[in-house]
């Protein structure tokens, strides 16, 4: 059955591909010459890797296509003749390269769709929990590669060809898993990829069997004496070999498509890893499933490489450039597979302080394949600037140890580690447990750039030998910002948070957009705050943040400058500095109360006043909101005895180091009912809401002088200044250190740190 017929058997696939071909007006062409197009493109002897090659292949295809169309004009079907004329006109209008690439890409899409549909029929089947147990793989065709051979270690660099292809025979699928392993429903996407790889391997089995027969016939021909049928036998062998080459090319095309799918899954995993740097959920365990795909692909390409080498030993003609080219393609594919499987699985800290220890690890997703683990290489690490990383990646710099030493932008201690293979989980990795950045070289800054905007990356690299040729592999970490002092941390996290949230999956290091929609930014802020504090932001919270960012200007987009560079109106700090300080205050001093919903937090003063005045409980109703004017401050708004709203001066982390927030609230008898952060809930009594957070206070002790120091013990309590009882309708007051006379027993909330209340005197 042709590929298009298989597509047509699924209405959704047919509609999808019809729309794809109709984009260029090629649907009629695809329908009219379906089998010919499939055979012609899939049997290409040269896969175009350069622009010149692509143009030559496309022109040849265009020429053959026109000849094929002209040959159909002799048909008696008048409608067909008319369609041929139209198709010939189409070919004249579209460039040869555009025509060829669109059809070739279409075939790759069709291959993926057909395989996905075949997987859907078996997707409900259970698979063993152990990702390395292949005994229950559904049988797709009459032939299957021996499971033990599929994932076996290729310890020899030059295995015997027949063994390299692997024993291929009928396998009964019992569908019964080992009881000790348990049964689970696998992740469908990765299972589909694994299923497609297995299916392609099974189909390649037919090619392997044909190759064995060809080798036997070739050996018989060489050993036999002259025979009158020798010429016919020779021609037959040539035809058999050509058919095998065609099958191999098709298999290689399948392999390329499958490799692309696995790389896509790995890129998604890396993207999720970056999102996890902001606190997003991340299933690190899915990397084991991706490794399984890499190992299966390595087995696939190893079988193919062995088969090509065996086929080249059947020398029927002097020169076979197409077979030589196929060998080069397969060897390069194996090399690319090995290189792409080298990743950073445990990222270093993305805000990295000099002279501070940190850890990271890299992993090679080929496991025990190729036998590299028997002689594990040593992985080295250097730090690169953004510019150096771009040059290395975009120019595809040839890597050697001598040139890399000059690429480093700093000095890292303990920057080498030998890879280790863990037999129990098939992980082949190198752990850097005690690295330390001693020095950093910075680039010259331009304009408003600061050291906190400058991105670096750790560059991990090693060298190994595979099948007698040397392979150098490398990988980059996520971007890091290097600081030398703690006060550089907030802006550094702005750089990292923006990059993790909005980086494209594929990009040059470390290019990033300078503006995003509010919808995008709100998700990033919510993830960041929620992961740090244990409770997500509400819709009202996010609306308030939107007002803060947009100010008077209403736009769909939020720029990088608005986010962390430009001070907010009438303030000396940026939005990010304000947001980060609140996040830190909440995490360090109010975490339990925030999680319990006791703190409304992100609400403007006007709305706070309105909500409190509308409360049915009236006097004594209060809420906690984050200060607009104070970095890392929280303030209390409450309804006073006159029915007006009073705003207390904000408290900061420095205040909570003396007395925690819950105890401060307990001291204020003017606070009775907590206004709920949930608009659908009712106010809660103060002691019910905050009681679990109160600290245990000791009973007053008799007035006793310490015989050594001569001092009397004292306790601290919070009171509200009398001048605050009339309510405040102005903006939240700035933090002010005011003196007071001890005689009246009252003091301002903002002056708490400078005053001691001696209760026992």
UniProtKB/Swiss-Prot annotation:
Q: Does the keyword DNA-binding apply?
A: yes
* Keywords for this protein: Activator, Cytoplasm, Developmental protein, DNA-binding, Nucleus, Phosphoprotein, SH2 domain, Transcription, Transcription regulation
**Gene Ontology molecular-function annotations:** cytokine receptor binding; DNA binding; DNA-binding transcription activator activity, RNA polymerase II-specific; DNA-binding transcription factor activity, RNA polymerase II-specific; histone binding; RNA polymerase II cis-regulatory region sequence-specific DNA binding
- Give the phenotype of cells or organisms lacking this gene: Exibits aberrant expression of the pair rule gene even-skipped at the cellular blastoderm stage, leading to larval segmentation defects.
Which InterPro entries does the UniProt entry name for this protein?
Answer: p53-like_TF_DNA-bd_sf (IPR008967), SH2 (IPR000980), SH2_dom_sf (IPR036860), STAT (IPR001217), STAT_linker (IPR048988), STAT_N_sf (IPR036535), STAT_TF_alpha (IPR013800), STAT_TF_coiled-coil (IPR015988)
Q: Which Gene3D superfamilies match?
A: EF-hand, SH2 domain, STAT transcription factor, all-alpha domain, STAT transcription factor, DNA-binding domain, STAT transcription factor, N-terminal domain
Which residue range or ranges hold the SH2 domain? 594-658
Pfam families recorded: SH2, STAT_alpha, STAT_bind, STAT_int, STAT_linker
- SUPFAM superfamilies referenced in this protein's UniProt entry, alphabetically: p53-like transcription factors, SH2 domain, STAT
GO BP annotations of the record are: antiviral innate immune response; blastoderm segmentation; border follicle cell migration; cell dedifferentiation; cell surface receptor signaling pathway via JAK-STAT; cell surface receptor signaling pathway via STAT; cellular response to lipopolysaccharide; cellular response to X-ray
Classification via PROSITE patterns: SH2
Q: Where in the cell is it found?
A: Cytoplasm; Nucleus
Entry GO CC:
cytoplasm; cytoplasmic side of apical plasma membrane; cytosol; nucleoplasm; nucleus
Q: Where is the signal peptide?
A: none
Q: What is its main location?
A: cytoplasm
Q: Which family does it belong to?
A: Belongs to the transcription factor STAT family.
Question: Cross-referenced PANTHER family, in alphabetical order?
Answer: SIGNAL TRANSDUCER AND ACTIVATOR OF TRANSCRIPTION
Give the protein name, as stated in the record. Signal transducer and transcription activator
Organism, per UniProt? Answer: Drosophila melanogaster (Fruit fly)
């Amino acid at each position: 059955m042709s590929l298009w017929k298989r597509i047509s058997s699924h209405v959704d696939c047919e509609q999808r591909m019809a729309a794809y071909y109709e984009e260029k007006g090629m649907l009629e062409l695809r329908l009219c010459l379906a089998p010919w197009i499939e055979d012609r493109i899939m049997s290409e002897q040269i896969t175009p890797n350069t622009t010149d090659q692509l143009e030559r292949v496309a022109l040849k295809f265009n020429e053959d296509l026109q000849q094929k169309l002209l040959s159909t004009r002799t048909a008696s079907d008048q409608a067909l003749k008319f369609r041929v004329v139209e198709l010939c006109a189409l070919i004249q209008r579209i460039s040869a390269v555009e025509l060829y690439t669109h059809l070739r890409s279409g075939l790759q899409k069709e291959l993926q769709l057909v395989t996905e549909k075949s997987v859907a029929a078996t997707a409900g089947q259970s698979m063993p929990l152990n990702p390395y147990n292949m005994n229950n793989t559904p049988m797709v065709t009459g032939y299957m590669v021996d499971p033990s051979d599929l994932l076996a270690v290729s310890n020899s660099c030059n295995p015997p060809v027949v063994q390299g292809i692997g024993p291929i025979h009928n396998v009964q699928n019992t569908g019964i898993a080992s009881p000790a392993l348990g049964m689970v429903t696998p992740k469908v996407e990765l299972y589909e990829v694994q299923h497609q790889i297995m299916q392609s391997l099974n189909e390649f089995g037919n090619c392997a069997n044909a190759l064995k027969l060809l080798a036997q016939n070739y050996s018989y021909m060489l050993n036999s004496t002259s025979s009158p049928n020798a010429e016919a036998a020779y021609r037959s062998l040539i035809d058999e070999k050509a058919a095998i080459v065609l099958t191999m090319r098709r298999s290689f095309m399948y392999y390329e498509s499958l490799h692309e799918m696995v790389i896509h899954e790995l890129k998604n995993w890396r993207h999720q890893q970056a999102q996890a740097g902001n606190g997003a959920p991340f299933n690190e365990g899915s990397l084991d499933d991706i490794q399984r795909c890499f190992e299966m692909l390595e087995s696939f390409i190893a079988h193919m490489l062995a088969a090509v080498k065996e086929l080249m030993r059947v020398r029927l003609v002097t020169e076979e450039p197409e077979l030589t080219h196929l060998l080069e393609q397969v060897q390069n594919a194996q090399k690319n597979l090995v290189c792409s499987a080298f990743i950073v699985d445990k990222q270093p800290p993305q805000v990295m302080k000099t002279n501070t220890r940190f850890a990271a690890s890299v992993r090679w997703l080929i496991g025990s394949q190729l036998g590299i683990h028997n002689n594990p290489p040593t992985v080295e690490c250097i730090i690169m600037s953004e510019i150096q990383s771009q040059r290395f990646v975009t120019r595809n710099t040839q890597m050697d140890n001598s040139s890399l030493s000059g690429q480093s932008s700093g000095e890292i201690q303990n920057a080498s580690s030998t890879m280790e293979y863990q037999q129990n989980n098939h992980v082949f990795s190198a752990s850097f447990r005690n690295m330390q950045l001693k020095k950093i070289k910075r680039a010259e800054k331009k304009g408003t750039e600061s050291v906190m905007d400058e991105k670096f990356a750790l560059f991990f690299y090693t060298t190994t030998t595979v099948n007698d040729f040397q392979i150098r592999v490398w990988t980059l970490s996520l971007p890091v910002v290097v600081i030398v002092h703690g006060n550089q941390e907030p802006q550094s996290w702005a750089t990292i948070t923006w990059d993790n949230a909005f980086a494209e999956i594929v990009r040059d290091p470390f290019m990033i957009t300078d503006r995003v929609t509010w919808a995008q930014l709100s998700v990033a802020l919510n993830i960041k705050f929620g992961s740090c504090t244990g409770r997500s932001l509400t819709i009202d919270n996010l609306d308030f943040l939107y007002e803060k960012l947009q100010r008077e200007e209403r736009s769909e987009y939020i720029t990088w400058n608005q986010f962390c560079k430009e001070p907010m109106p009438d303030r000396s700090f940026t939005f990010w500095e304000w947001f980060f300080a609140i996040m830190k205050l909440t995490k360090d001093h109010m975490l339990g109360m925030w999680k319990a919903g006791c703190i409304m937090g992100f609400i403007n003063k006007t709305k706070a006043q309105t909500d409190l005045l509308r409360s049915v409980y009236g006097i004594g109703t209060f809420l906690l909101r984050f200060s607009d004017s104070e970095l890392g401050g929280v303030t209390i708004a409450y309804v006073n005895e006159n029915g007006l709203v009073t705003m207390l001066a904000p408290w900061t982390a420095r205040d909570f180091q003396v007395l925690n927030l819950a105890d401060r609230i307990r001291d204020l008898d003017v606070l009775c009912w907590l206004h709920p952060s949930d608009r659908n809930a009712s106010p809660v009594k103060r002691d019910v809401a905050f009681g679990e957070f109160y600290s245990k206070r000791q009973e007053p002790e008799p007035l006793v002088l310490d015989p050594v120091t001569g001092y009397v013990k004292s306790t601290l309590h919070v009171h509200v200044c009398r001048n605050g009882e009339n309510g405040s309708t102005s903006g939240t007051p700035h933090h002010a250190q005011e003196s007071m006379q001890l005689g009246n027993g009252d003091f301002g909330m903002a002056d708490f740190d400078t005053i001691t209340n001696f209760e026992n005197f």
